[in-house]
């Protein structure tokens, strides 16, 4: 295992991140100033709460666009996101929501995780 500059809620640590089954179980090391060394940076992933698209694709394009969008976002540090719809006919939005639900359950490797949906509409009737 290599040492990294790890950003924690308490500040920077020079050390190692230990993980098991995809979860962080410990961070070993001591406080540091990353400017004092040439080690790589290890940062938490970002959660984007408003994603219309990525990689030239839009959420409203449906199932075929989702993998391009989520793969593009993970390349830039977004580990999870809320897919955001646009104002459209209700049937189109319903189809996209169904497809997003199915895609989110699959959780493809190498892609940002879809946590849910941000409905962006001009008016919602309940």
How would you name each of these model-derived features?
Residues 124-126:
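Conserved small/polar residues in nucleotide/adenosyl-binding loops
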Residues 1-31:
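N-terminal metal-binding scaffold of metallo-dependent hydrolase/deaminase domains
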């Amino acid at each position: 295992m290599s040492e990294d500059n790890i950003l924690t809620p308490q500040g920077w640590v020079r050390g190692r991140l230990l993980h098991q089954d995809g979860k962080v179980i410990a961070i070993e090391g001591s406080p540091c100033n990353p400017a004092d060394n040439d080690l790589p940076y290890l940062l938490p992933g970002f959660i984007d709460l408003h994603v219309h698209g990525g990689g030239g694709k839009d959420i409203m394009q449906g199932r075929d666009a989702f993998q391009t969008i989520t793969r593009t976002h993970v390349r830039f540090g977004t580990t999870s996101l809320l897919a955001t719809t646009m104002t459209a006919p209700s049937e189109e939005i319903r189809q996209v929501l169904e497809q997003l639900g199915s895609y989110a359950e699959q959780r493809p490797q190498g892609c940002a995780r879809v946590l849910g949906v941000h409905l962006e509409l001009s008016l919602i009737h309940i």
